[in-house]
């Protein structure tokens, strides 16, 4: 076992530069490089040594595995690579060890014992009771043996536990991401703040939980968008406790409510919602219907909502001249509209009516606050940014106006296209 590395970033950076598609790269070439790794290089210990190391050091070293998995997935914008994503998913689904911080608050409870083993390279431990994995729903079973891999005397102490039955890193990624963005019922209890801190799982979360959550959300979004069958397989693998939809909405809300507004969180949350839409549409409608996320503002829809709402996201991006979040929001609105149009004659009319009214509010906001004067705005990142904004608005409005339901006479049960009008 290699010595614990407190900072794997330089090595991971090198691999990410090699395997992760950058602007201007040929996506097929990157996918072919990742295919070679998963079909050939993985068989040689020296070539797979970094992946093996970050798997063994997970989750105490949290980000290295996430970043490396993202790079080795072979995905690029608009260029999915199902075979390499499937290989990466499988590698993370079977992890035979976990590196965990020894929880000092339980040191006096006899949760573990130290063993005196001749010739052992470091302090060895044996669990005398099940040990929960902080910030997750998982436990390391009693009887598991571990070895200290952090330098002796260094705090926090990190122990590598060898598991008799492999576990899934996806469950740890999911649980840590969800618990970092979705408020827990005990979040207001001062006595629970220490146990709820994500730094108990990994020092990577210290002072940077927002960034870590964004990177995990981006990984999930890329996998789910690659192929619907792979997305369904991943959600099924996560099981009944899967909660990516509320976590996505919470990530957007957190980004919109932060000061200054965190566009990266907002963008990552919208992307994950779009990736989940074909797989969990009803959950998404349930969680967005009472919020302002579809107009780019935090909080909930007021009971008396007669005025056209304003958007914290649009206000922020008009000031900066960079409209990354607004572009993604308009893409999400278009995806939601496509979903309504494809299911409006299948879903119950009452459900479709609610969905249409929710979307009508958001499209009305776009027509009132974006369309009239977006050509006069300042675009810092791209002088032709107004053209991109025009295209996304026109695509959205055209999809509404071209709906065949407009040709039908209006009744007491108006079709969704009429509501959107």
Identify the meaning behind each predicted range.
Residues 1-421:
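Extended alpha-helical scaffold regions
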């Amino acid at each position: 076992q290699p010595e614990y590395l407190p900072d794997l970033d330089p090595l991971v950076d090198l691999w990410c530069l090699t395997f992760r598609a950058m602007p201007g790269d040929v996506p097929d070439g990157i996918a072919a490089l990742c295919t070679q790794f998963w079909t050939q290089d993985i068989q040689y210990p020296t070539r797979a040594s970094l992946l093996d190391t970050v798997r063994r050091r997970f989750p105490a070293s949290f980000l290295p595995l996430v970043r490396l998995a993202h790079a080795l997935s072979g995905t690029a914008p608009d260029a999915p690579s199902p075979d390499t994503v499937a290989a990466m998913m499988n590698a993370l689904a079977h992890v035979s060890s976990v590196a965990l911080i020894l929880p000092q608050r339980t040191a006096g409870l006899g949760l573990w014992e130290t063993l005196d083993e001749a010739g052992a390279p470091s302090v060895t431990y044996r669990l005398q009771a099940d040990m929960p994995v902080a910030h997750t729903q998982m436990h390391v079973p009693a009887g598991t043996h571990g070895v200290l891999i952090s330098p002796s005397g260094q705090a926090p102490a990190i122990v590598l536990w060898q598991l008799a039955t492999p576990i899934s890193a996806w469950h740890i990624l999911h649980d840590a991401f969800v618990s970092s963005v979705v408020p827990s019922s005990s979040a207001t209890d001062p006595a629970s703040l220490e146990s709820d801190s994500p730094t108990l799982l990994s020092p990577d979360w210290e002072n940077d939980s927002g960034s870590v959550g964004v990177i995990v959300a981006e990984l999930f979004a890329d996998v789910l968008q690659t192929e619907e069958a792979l997305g369904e397989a991943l959600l099924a693998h996560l099981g009944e406790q899967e909660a990516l939809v509320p976590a996505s909405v919470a990530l957007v809300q957190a980004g919109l409510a932060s000061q200054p507004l965190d566009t990266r969180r907002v963008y990552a949350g919208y992307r994950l919602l779009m990736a989940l839409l074909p797989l969990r549409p009803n959950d998404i409608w349930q969680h967005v219907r009472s919020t302002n996320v579809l107009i780019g503002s935090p909080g909930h829809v007021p009971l008396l909502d007669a005025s056209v709402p304003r958007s914290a996201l649009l206000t922020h991006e008009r000031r900066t001249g960079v409209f990354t979040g607004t572009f993604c929001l308009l893409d999400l609105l278009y995806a939601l509209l496509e979903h309504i149009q494809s299911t409006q004659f299948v879903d119950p009319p009452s459900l479709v009516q609610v969905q249409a009214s929710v979307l009508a509010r958001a499209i009305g906001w776009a027509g009132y606050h974006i369309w009239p004067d977006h050509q006069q705005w300042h675009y810092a990142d791209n002088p032709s940014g107004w053209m991109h904004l025009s295209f996304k608005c026109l695509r959205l409005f055209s999809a509404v106006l071209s709906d065949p339901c407009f040709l039908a006479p209006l009744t007491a049960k108006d079709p969704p296209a009429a509501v959107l009008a």
